[in-house]
């Protein structure tokens, strides 16, 4: 069974793909409204897949039955793998892991979906740094193929192998990163987005021109400013702060 902490955009996306891959999933969030929104989003996104003949209606209904939505952590002790997918704030994540560990069975693996924060630092607040790993899914999870895997200093080989097997069972591809600030994707992507913001600030081009230039000139599917909005400017800022402080 797979537990997911955080029912936001990343959490509901991970629940979506895990349930379709045949896993029983528990998605937890203290905000009842977030749980209900996640349920609605997952149903809507799966319905779109049905309409595009990517999955059948029977597969959708079976996947939805595999997901349990809960505003508490009562069922978390049953989980073999727990993935934290909360906001990109280290203090929030550390508190989640501190509260979570006493409720988990000893064999459970803990993963974080952080896009930038040190895996070793997050693992240090847990009772199982050897069973802790970074598992950075890309947004939107149902569409994006890549997952970055990041070992902390204490992550054991068995944990890494189990995490990689899980990711591959979802039909995803892994890229292994060392535990450096922002890992691989965001180490490259966020400075580019930041430079696009400066290009706008300095009047080099309009929003439309900058995005068009990168779509058509660099073959990017989405312009950097549009992408920043899609990621969330708060998340972009958090990652840039990690890069500023860590490099």
For each predicted feature, which ranges?
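Rossmann-fold NAD(P)-binding glycine/threonine-rich loop
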Residues: 94-146, 151-164
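Internal alpha-helical scaffold of NAD(P)-dependent oxidoreductase catalytic cores
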Residues: 23, 128, 147-180, 192-221
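Rossmann-like NAD(P)-binding element
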Residues: 9, 30-37, 48-110, 116-117
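NAD(P)+-binding Rossmann beta1-loop-alpha1 motif at the extreme N-terminus of oxidoreductases
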Residues: 1-45, 52, 103
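Interdomain hinge/lid region at the active-site interface
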Residues: 208, 212-247
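A short glycine-threonine-serine/GTX helix/turn-capping micro-motif
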Residues: 178-187, 226
């Amino acid at each position: 069974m797979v537990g997911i902490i955080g029912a936001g955009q990343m959490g509901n996306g991970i629940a979506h793909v895990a349930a379709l891959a045949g896993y029983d999933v528990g998605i937890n969030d203290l905000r009842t409204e977030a749980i209900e929104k996640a349920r609605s989003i997952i149903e809507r996104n799966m319905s779109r897949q049905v309409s595009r003949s990517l999955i059948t209606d029977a597969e959708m209904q079976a996947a939805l039955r595999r997901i349990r939505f809960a505003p508490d952590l009562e069922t978390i002790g049953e989980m073999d793998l727990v993935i934290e997918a909360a906001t990109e704030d280290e203090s929030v994540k550390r508190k989640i892991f501190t509260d979570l560990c006493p409720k988990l069975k000893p064999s459970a693996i803990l993963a974080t979906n952080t896009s930038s924060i040190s895996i070793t630092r997050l693992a240090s607040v847990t009772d199982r740094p050897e069973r802790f790993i970074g598992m950075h899914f890309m947004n939107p999870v149902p569409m994006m193929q890549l997952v970055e895997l990041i070992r902390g200093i204490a992550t054991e080989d068995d944990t890494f192998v189990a995490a990689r097997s899980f990711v591959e069972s979802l039909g995803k591809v892994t890229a292994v990163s060392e535990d450096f600030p922002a890992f691989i994707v965001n180490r490259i992507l966020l400075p580019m987005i930041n430079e696009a913001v400066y290009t706008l600030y300095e009047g080099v081009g309009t929003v439309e021109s900058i995005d068009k230039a990168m779509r058509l000139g660099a073959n990017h599917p989405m312009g950097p400013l549009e992408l920043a909005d899609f990621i969330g400017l708060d998340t972009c800022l958090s990652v840039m702060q990690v890069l500023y402080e860590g490099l």
